[in-house]
Every structure is written in structure tokens, then in C-alpha cells.
């Protein structure tokens, strides 16, 4: 079902109903771009740590816009042994609600726009008819504006005319406004004396003059009139005064309050759908979904925190249970029988032996998708086939039980090992980002960090390391790369070869990481020392409170890269070979290591705790057991 601004309100109850009755959801997003600077290859280096990958995506991807959101709900019909689906395709755009609303700025990537256009994407539905939204801070600010407005005019929203914050004594009116107020009072006196006229429209005036009018009338006419501010077609604000009895005045105030609440809900817009998904506590499925999750949290909840651990805490607060089908398909027992994990190819493979495609039917009134026609890169369709892939793989796990089960539900312990682990694209030895604990820290004692002139190409690196047999190269930027050797014993020899070289330098991966950690510590120490110097000065000034602001990244350039979508990025053959070769022997001590530079408390963690407080009434459908299933655990080694 296609949802745009004009039919969003009329169909919102259908969305809520679908979410409420579903067993699980599948989601997908389409964006205005992927990377504002680095190429996709540089953005997804094979030896990124989870922290580095998060920082790259946060810096280079979050200024793009998620402008199409696909949601497909799945409910199992036990009578007919089939799934009933409801698919929604939302077009989203941050239309300013009023003059004080945030005017969102975002960037576009030409290759991404060109690719979506080639797939028949209708951009008019985004820019002309996209559903507005607000994040939680913007919603809070808008609510405060409404509360302040009601406080000035109608007693903070109470039905009594006089505000408890408004003086019941005569108002002090500036000399230059006395004539204006006297004229208004005179017109109101004429209105009250007239038997024919019921309403009086005052001329448009300034906000200060309207405030004086409200204050004067609340003191002079506590009963008998109703005062309301309206807007002309030219956006000029004016006051309408009506003669009413007390019952009619209360009725109008109730209508006005209901209208304001409706306007507020309209401004929150699509965020209400995301809140409903989050508050359900149900399993959310995605394919290669790290970017989808980051954009969803960033766009509809709050800006992403600087620290990865804070992002994890925030994400699990919003979405208690996530499952990535790309990771699932890349893990045993699927890894050996699924060669290509891109979404389109995965959907095709799961129709073949040993898998059984699920029996699926669209709910009445909802359009059905034909997978033979492949409507890829329509978010609703991608969400639909993502859900199909999950069902097929989950049911396949049931075949290992004794006796075998043909249907494995979204609440089954068989799929718990895959919860809250998001696939890391192209990382050779860390398959996933673990949202519920420390990330894997594999040994990289066979990896070298190499710096070299900008003119060098891949062939130059192969020539440099020709004496060391098979190698794998992962470019970092134009002047550096990681090179992995086939044997760790060769590393000291390779490092020694660069001792007297002028054009290049080779160091071990451990040395590279150690120097980066030192730089990070020095930078933080400098920041802390600077703060110690600033703090006394702040206390001695009268310039108000000082607060650290979030750092907002802006695109310095729009680099048109090759036409690539996040769905069809699969590990290269070389990377796959190294992935299979990696020993991955990780000790418990290594797994428990955390970043020694991590701050104990920060703005991001405060936001996560705030989200938890807002969701204290959450009643998830189903529960997550602390004990993982013994079968098919996502491996600690890759």
C-alpha cells in the first residue's frame, strides 16, 4: 500500500492495526545517497573495527535522507499454515510545519539518484507529497510552543478564560500602544452593545500587540467573549472576538485544543509509525540493515551519539529485537549452501532445495507482490522479500529438530542467536556488530599497515609484496592500505624491508592501532585540559549557561561513485577467501576488552536513558530468553 502525505492520516489506523496483530515486521529504506566523500570501497574497508565502521557511517552517511521507508508485517495463520502480509511503502520528507519549525538540510549523491530514477522511482512523491516527521527533541519543542501559546491566551490550556499566570489587575500598557488598545476596547464595547453582530475581526497586528490584547481582555472581560488568533491567506495573524455564553466558550476552547493536538500529530507525522513499531517490542527484520537502523534512529528519534557503545544502548532501547537476514545467510548452517547473499539472489536461492518457500498471501485490500517481476529498490517490496527470506531460513532450522518442524515462529529459541547482531559489510574477520555486548576482536597478527605515494596503484603493492606469496589488499585511502599476508611469521620480515625505504613505510597492525589509540588519548586529554581552563572563566561571566553541542557533519563535496546500492554489495572473491582462511581464535579476555578511552557518561548515554524512561510502559510481544539456543549459534569466530 502506497502511503503519501495526502492519505497518511486516513490510513494510519490500518498501519497501527497491522503492527498490533503482526508476529514480526520486515523493514527497508531508500536513501538520497550512501557516502558524501569516500568511495563505497573506502567506506567499507575490510579491516575496519566496529567502532571505525560506525564512525565512518555516522560522518559520511547521516547527512543523506531516508525518504522511502518500506514496512511489511507478517502474521501466521495456523489454520491454513500460511502467512498473511500487509505491505506499506511510505514516502517521507521533512516539510517544515510552521515558521519556527526546523528547516532540514540534506545532501544527495548523483549516482544514487540516477540509480533510483533508472528503477522508476517517483521523486515527486517524495518532494511534493512526502509525509513530514519530527524527532523527539523537535516534537518536545513544538509541544512547548503550543503550551506557551495556550498559556498566553487561554490559561495554559484550561477551560477558564483567565490564565493562572495572568494578572487579574489592570495591565501596564506602554505609552505608544495605549491608543491602539483603547481602540480595541472601544470596538469590543460596540460589539457587546450590538444585537446584530456576533463576531469582531481585528486588523492584523504584531505578536506583542496580540499579547497586550489578550492580557487586557482577560482582565477587563473575564466572561462573555471568546478570543482566538487566526491567519489570513497571506500568513498575517489577526484576532477574532466572539460574543458567547460560558457553555459556548468552553465548547470552542475544546475544539481549539483538539485542533492543536491534531496539528501536532500531523507534524510528528511518520515518526508515529516508527514509535508504534518500537513500542510493540516485536522482532524487526532487515537485510544488511545497519544503515537502515542508523538512519531510522538518527532521523526519527535523535542525532546519533559519538560513541559506539552509546549507539548500541540507544538502538536496543528503540528496537529491542533486530535480526539481519544477510548475517543469518552468511552463518552456519546456511553459509555452505548459499553462495550469494545479496537480497535478490538470496530470495531466488531460498526457493530451491533444501529450502521450502513459505506459503504467503496478501491481506484483503492490500496489493500483492509478484517476486518474478522483481520490484527491487522499492522499499516496500524489499521489505516483503526480506521477510520471505527470514521465514525460509527459520523454517529450515526447524528441519534439524527431532521431530522436525515445518514452521518456526519469530518467538522460537532457534533464532535467538541471531538477535541484535548486524552484518558488517566487507569486514573480513568480524562478521557482525553486536548490539548487546562487546564486539569480536580477532587476531590480526598477519596484517600490515602500509603508507605510500599517492601515485601508487594496486599493482605496485602486489609487486612490493611479491616475495610473500598470496596477499590481500584493503585500501584505506589514496596513500594507505592494509595488506594481509598468508603467514604471520612473514610479518617481521616485511616490516624490516621498509626500514630504509624512502617512498613507503610498513608497520604491524598492532603498532598502527596503538598509535591511533595514543592519538585519541592525547586529543581527549587536550580537550579535558582545555575545559579546565574554560570552566573558571565561564563561572566568572554573566553570559548565561554553556553547553557542549553535538558536532554536525556537513558534506564538503558530492563525489559521484559507481552506481551501487546497499543491497548488492557482496564481499569480493578475495575477501571471501580470506574470510574462510581466518583462524579467528579469540580468547575470553580479548572478547571482554573494551575501549579504555570510553567516557563513563555522555550526552548519548543520557539520550538512551531518556528513551528508556519514555518506553517504561513497553509491553513487548514475546520475550527474549537470557539463555541462547544451542543449535546454530552465530559463531564467535568467522
Curated annotation (Swiss-Prot):
GO biological processes: box H/ACA sno(s)RNA 3'-end processing; miRNA catabolic process; nuclear-transcribed mRNA catabolic process, nonsense-mediated decay; nuclear-transcribed mRNA poly(A) tail shortening; poly(A)-dependent snoRNA 3'-end processing; priRNA 3'-end processing; siRNA 3'-end processing
Cofactor annotation comment: Divalent metal cations. Mg(2+) is the most probable.
Amino acid composition bias (Basic residues), ranges on this chain: 606-615
Domain spans labelled R3H: 178-245
Biased composition annotated in UniProt, kind: Polar residues: 152-165
Coiled-coil spans in chain: none
Subcellular compartments: Nucleus; Cytoplasm; Nucleus, Nucleolus
Any one GO molecular-function label of the UniProt entry: 3'-5'-RNA exonuclease activity
Enzyme Commission number(s) from the entry: 3.1.13.4
Chain spans, region Disordered: 143-165, 573-638
Gene3D superfamilies: 3.30.70.330, Ribonuclease H-like superfamily/Ribonuclease H (3.30.420.10)
Alphabetic keyword roster: Acetylation, Cytoplasm, Exonuclease, Hydrolase, Magnesium, Metal-binding, Nonsense-mediated mRNA decay, Nuclease, Nucleus, Phosphoprotein, RNA-binding
Binding site for a divalent metal cation: 28, 30, 292, 382
InterPro entries, alphabetized: CAF1_poly(A)_ribonucleases, Nucleotide-bd_a/b_plait_sf, PARN_R3H, PolyA-riboNase_RNA-binding, R3H_dom, R3H_dom_sf, RBD_domain_sf, RNase_CAF1
Keyword Hydrolase recorded: yes
Phosphoserine: residues carrying this PTM: 163, 167, 530, 557, 583, 587, 619, 623, 627
CDD domains (UniProt xref): R3H_PARN, RRM_PARN
Domain of life: Eukaryota
Reported modifications of this chain: Phosphorylation by MAPKAPK2, preventing GADD45A mRNA degradation after genotoxic stress.
Cofactor(s) needed: Mg(2+)
Site (Interaction with poly(A)): 326
Similarity comment text for this entry: Belongs to the CAF1 family.
Function: 3'-exoribonuclease that has a preference for poly(A) tails of mRNAs, thereby efficiently degrading poly(A) tails. Exonucleolytic degradation of the poly(A) tail is often the first step in the decay of eukaryotic mRNAs and is also used to silence certain maternal mRNAs translationally during oocyte maturation and early embryonic development. Involved in nonsense-mediated mRNA decay, a critical process of selective degradation of mRNAs that contain premature stop codons.
PANTHER family named in the record: POLY A -SPECIFIC RIBONUCLEASE/TARGET OF EGR1, MEMBER 1 (PTHR15092), POLY(A)-SPECIFIC RIBONUCLEASE PARN (PTHR15092:SF44)
Complex formation: Homodimer. Found in a mRNA decay complex with RENT1, RENT2 and RENT3B. Interacts with KHSRP. Interacts with CELF1/CUGBP1. Interacts with ZC3HAV1 in an RNA-independent manner. Interacts with DHX36.
This protein's name: Poly(A)-specific ribonuclease PARN
